[in-house]
Amino acid sequence: MSAGQAPKEIGEISFGLMDPEEYRDMSATKVITADTYDDDGFPIDMGLMDPRLGVIDPGLECKTCGQRSGGCNGHFGHIELAAPVIHVGFSKLIRRLLRGTCRECASLLLTEEEKDEYRENLDRTRSLRQDVSDVMTAAIREARKKDHCPHCGEVQYDVKHEKPTTYYEVQQVLASDYSERIAASMQPDEDEDDAGVSPQELAEQTDIDISRINEILSGEFRPRREDREAIETAIGADLTTEDMNKLMPSDIRDWFEDIPGEDLEALGVNSDRSRPEWMILTVLPVPPVTARPSITLDNGQRSEDDLTHKLVDIIRINQRFMENREAGAPQLIIEDLWELLQYHVTTFMDNEISGTPPARHRSGRPLKTLSQRLKGKEGRFRGSLSGKRVNFSARTVISPDPTLSLNEVGVPDRVATEMTQTMVVNEQNLERARRYVRNGPEGHPGANYVTRPDGRRVRVTEKVCEELAERVEPGWEVQRHLIDGDIIIFNRQPSLHRMSIMAHEVVVMPYKTFRLNTVVCPPYNADFDGDEMNMHALQNEEARAEARVLMRVQEQILSPRFGENIIGAIQDHISGTYLLTNDNPRFNETQASDLLRQTRIDELPAAAGTDEDGDQYWTGHQIFSELLPDDLSLEFTGTTGDTVVIEDGQLLEGTIADDEVGEYGSEIVDTITKVHGNTRARIFINEVASLAMRSIMHFGFSIGIDDETVSTEARERIDEAIQSAYDRVQELIETYENGDLESLPGRTVDETLEMKIMQTLGKARDSAGDVAEENFDEDNPAVVMANSGARGSMLNLTQMAGCVGQQAVRGERINRGYEDRTLSHFAPNDLSSEAHGFVENSYTSGLTPKEFFFHAMGGREGLVDTAVRTSKSGYLQRRLINALSELETQYDGTVRDTSDTIVQFEFGEDGTSPVQVSSNEEVDIDVEHVADRILNSEFDSDTQKAEFLEVEEPPTNLSEHGAAWEVESDD
């Protein structure tokens, strides 16, 4: 846009086809030679690297615009094709038009009344802002039904499309063996008691003279169309064969040139902007050099872009075509060269068309042509526009650090010195800015660059840092290192929801990994088995302010998906709070102080009592209560099934475990967040994590093989339960083989047998689990983890200690394998438990080779299912994001798209954020408390609050209302 020119608002954008003349007009040069560079290494004129198409080499000037490399965006050229070729992108549309228009007069095969009706449909569709392609499809479908042109009366033939770019006109003609077909159909058929048809009878049925029938039967006369159809009807024979006439691109172009413009308008095509003959190319645009740059290899040779390779092929075949045609070569050679030219133009457009061999390098690698540059994950749209590589980002492995706040992230010092934030120098921060510059790029906190007021950027080095520091004045900008407290954005892929990218505060730390508090793992779906995460350093104050207010971790404690907390205590934290509060253990003063020393609590509450020795003690409930807000009152059923009672910030009853403080909807965290705010919730979660870690270290908590080993007596009871199940299964099999097994309603006998065997073996596993569970104490580490909800379940413990159980594929016992048996270790048609995937061993005792094989079969199904679901859900999510990305909630509360169409009159139909709604019927939000908290944060005095609430001040003098006021005051 030139200076002083006012910007204009775009009313609409319409797409159309380009006229060959437009290709020529925008072209900087005609390309006629396939050579690129001369012997001296300079681009050849009218070649594919002509300087008029743009320049990529430093020092050269573009001969079209005069700009140097970097300033010139490049210019198109063109190739004059020796013969028309079909644009493969329009092959389906070409087929539709060939089938819907007359082969003689090229008019649309619809009557004038039908055309008017479709024009009205188009106007109505456009006024409703709907897609007009459905109307066009309906018009072509209607036109295809006509076998005669309603305008010129010409007979119409079907058009067959042989992908990608070959078209045939299919005509039904009289078969060469028509007389034999008639004679064969007239013969008697003994199987169907058919006496056959004599020539005299055929003549009577068809009203054809008997002499003519005899001439037809002898092959002396070829019947006309009316006679042929009459004979076919009489004897039920087909006397025709398909005659396929290939339509050359030049024929199709001539056909389309004759289509009237008003007929195109009935199909929704603007004939001024898009003529159908332009889909058959006579001129091929050549992309600018900047779109297909060549590179220089280490040995000095140039390597050309894939598009340039393809254009070389097109020019060479084009030249051969012209030379052979001018030399009068046979038609067969001309058609072969034409097909070859069509192939090269097709693969230049798209090198992944099914049924067409891809163009390849000498190495065998397929060329990456125009379509491949645009589509797919690595293409222009998804790879370069929607997502791209950015500066000011870092990526490394993550490690856990429970000493950090959930708002913080540990950043390696090496990253902190490489990443910078822009600091605008003023009077207040001048000395600090100079100190950063003086420290240089190596010292931390230092600076890497400074920007002068005139916009010039100067790199800070060890040599010039002292001098630069003295020159820094207000108005300069310093690109300083990241320091503690800086706000950055942290992300883990795949980014499936909003909380996959959140803002953290920097804590610069040694070593090379990002450090993260474990309570922040659930929203990122992160673990520490090698996961990597991305960090982005924000570059301006607006971005940093928005991130701090909207994206900080403490603002994401409640999930917008289900309205409950997604951040909370996990795994070891839950085991720690369980040990601290289960059975309400007692602690002496030293132990109680040690438990609370990493929290903000600086003094112990009053002791709960004294023991037999007269020493004071504090309880687990009492210590946990120190973390709760003073006015918190709750009562609900907890993880372990007992009732949790909290009154005025004191835990009176219950055990604190997953449902109380864990992630994904715990009562205490959810309530504190909604009633007391995100800051108080963040403090609570941090302190619960610290207290839980101290508790788990106090009690001691470890797990090993011995913790899952059952006693000899328990092992014998488990073996008895499994043997009893085996005996029951054998009885079922014998009953089935004797034919005495009754089928269940709606089931076959085979299905009934399988169901009963599965039920029997399922009960055996449950019995083994019950025995194993009885064998373990309540303080067993695996039992603690299962009961508290920290990790795993009693089923996992059952399989570790008792019996793994039946392995299933697609919900059934394992039946696949060899013929009539699952493995070669079993007899054919063996229906026993062992032969169909029952694993009687536990993980502790170890699986036999046969059991291991069956177990792997069951596990594979889970892996495959996970992979399939991941790819499907990822594709669906991307489709939804693309479809919904333009929707936006406006200031009037409506949800609208970019064309201002109202999608919802109120966001979510109720105008309510899930974060603000209580999802638990048992726990109501204390609305008054929330209102008081908001008012206290907004107003400094009670007078301001009263003005806001429009509460009238009580009278201050004892007038007529004085007595009434005194009474009210006494109350």
Swiss-Prot record:
Cofactor: Mg(2+); Zn(2+)
Spans annotated as Disordered: 185-204, 951-971
Binding site for Zn(2+) 1: 62, 65, 72, 75
Residues bearing PTM Blocked amino end (Met): 1
Gene Ontology molecular functions: DNA binding; DNA-directed RNA polymerase activity; magnesium ion binding; zinc ion binding
Main localization, broad class: cytoplasm
Cofactor: binding comment: Binds at least 2 Zn(2+) per subunit.
Listed InterPro entries: DNA-dir_RpoC_beta_prime, RNA_pol_asu, RNA_pol_N, RNA_pol_Rpb1_1, RNA_pol_Rpb1_3, RNA_pol_Rpb1_3_sf, RNA_pol_Rpb1_4, RNA_pol_Rpb1_5
Keywords: Cytoplasm, DNA-binding, DNA-directed RNA polymerase, Magnesium, Metal-binding, Nucleotidyltransferase, Transcription, Transferase, Zinc
Localization in the cell: Cytoplasm
Domain of life: Archaea
Gene Ontology cellular-component annotations: cytoplasm; DNA-directed RNA polymerase complex
Binding site for Mg(2+): 527, 529, 531
Binding site for Zn(2+) 2: 102, 105, 149, 152
Biological-process GO terms, alphabetical: DNA-templated transcription
PTM section of the record: The N-terminus is blocked.
Quaternary assembly: Part of the RNA polymerase complex.
Family label: Belongs to the RNA polymerase beta' chain family.
PANTHER family in alphabetical order: DNA-DIRECTED RNA POLYMERASE (PTHR19376), DNA-DIRECTED RNA POLYMERASE III SUBUNIT RPC1 (PTHR19376:SF32)
This protein's name: DNA-directed RNA polymerase subunit Rpo1N
Protein's organism: Halobacterium salinarum (strain ATCC 29341 / DSM 671 / R1)
Taxonomic lineage of the native organism: Archaea, Methanobacteriati, Methanobacteriota, Stenosarchaea group, Halobacteria
